[in-house]
């Protein structure tokens, strides 16, 4: 899962240094920026920071788990990287003006968050029902090797979602339709097109390669982009809330849509319209900068014939997908800072 996560984080840092649209780039190289962010995360692990923000926000606490989850969530979509860089710079420099402005913007745009409850059991039920008996355990010691294995895959985010394997280790309701067969030598009626992202924080390219190897005659197209989903959501939505909503309302999907690519779009259209596949080893570059602040799909889709009804419909769908993040502000629920604000008034910290 986290095989390429650190490479995506490195891409965030190198993209920041190369862009004028990154608040973190001043007086840094890519390596020094990585070191600075890592140092900040380690600092708040043992010394959480409390920020006293002006009314009506109040005091909020920034600690290790929050920052790790925010980092992982924002690696999902480069379209969020400029705004996340502003927020992260504000946190690292203790700039309460920047933090307050960000939180106020979030609170004003998130609407009535009380209507979007975090259905935490949904993710557990979906993922844990597919866990094989070998993934279950009766004690923390029994599941520790799995958790530690995830940590070894990624220094930056390997421990950002430890709750999931620990919860699944105790799950006692396996799905009836759980697949117990193999994934090799599968021959489908039609040949499959498999698309894998080169820099994906949670569904790495090696997984796409394994899928392609399992399906005979399939072709893997390597999408040379960062991230895993589009549209993006505001930086402070909690990781568990977002994961619980993936696929439920169409606002997030694991896909190759995080960065637009005319090459990938043409290959996908050729497959669905004509049944043709790209040549083995095909790689498609993306047509948007990592810190552009958008996913680039509007520009990509402008290359398709607007007079053709099918192309027009395709552009319409792509446009709605590219803009769905605005609706996502109202669909997903309160963000960590907003929940921190509410619970701080009660003297209780929200553990997300």
Outline where the language-model segments fall.
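C-terminal subdomain of alpha/beta-hydrolase-fold enzymes, centered on the catalytic histidine
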Residues: 1-352
């Amino acid at each position: 899962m986290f095989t390429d996560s650190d490479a995506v984080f490195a891409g965030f840092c190198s993209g920041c240094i190369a862009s004028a649209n990154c608040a973190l780039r001043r007086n840094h190289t890519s390596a020094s920026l990585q070191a600075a962010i890592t140092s900040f995360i380690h600092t708040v692990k043992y010394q959480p920071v409390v920020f006293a923000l002006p009314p009506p926000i109040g005091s909020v606490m920034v600690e290790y788990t929050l920052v790790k989850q925010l980092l992982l969530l924002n690696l999902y979509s480069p379209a969020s990287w400029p705004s996340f860089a502003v927020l992260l710079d504000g946190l690292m420099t203790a700039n309460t003006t920047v933090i307050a402005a960000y939180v106020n913007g979030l609170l004003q745009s998130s609407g009535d968050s009380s209507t979007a409850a975090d259905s935490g059991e949904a993710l557990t039920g979906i993922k844990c029902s597919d866990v094989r008996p070998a993934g279950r355990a009766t004690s923390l010691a029994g599941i520790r090797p799995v958790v530690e294995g995830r940590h070894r895959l990624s220094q930056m985010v390997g421990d950002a979602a430890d709750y999931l394997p620990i919860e699944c280790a105790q799950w006692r309701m396996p799905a009836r339709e759980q697949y117990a067969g193999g994934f090799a030598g599968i021959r489908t009626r039609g040949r499959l097109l498999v698309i894998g992202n080169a820099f994906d924080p949670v569904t790495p390219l090696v997984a796409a390669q394994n899928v392609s190897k399992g399906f005979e005659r399939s072709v893997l197209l390597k999408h040379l982009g960062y991230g895993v989903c589009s549209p993006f959501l505001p930086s402070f939505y909690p990781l568990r809330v977002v994961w619980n909503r993936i696929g439920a309302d169409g606002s997030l999907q694991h896909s190759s849509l995080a960065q637009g690519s005319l090459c990938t779009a043409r290959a996908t259209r050729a497959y669905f319209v004509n049944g043709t596949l790209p040549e083995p080893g095909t790689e498609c570059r993306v047509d948007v900068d990592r810190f552009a602040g958008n996913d680039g799909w509007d520009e990509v889709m402008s290359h398709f014939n607007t007079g053709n009804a099918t192309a027009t419909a395709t552009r319409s769908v792509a446009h709605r997908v590219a803009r769905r993040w605005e609706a996502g502000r109202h669909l997903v629920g309160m963000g960590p800072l907003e929940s921190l604000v509410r619970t701080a008034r009660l003297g209780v910290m929200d553990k997300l």
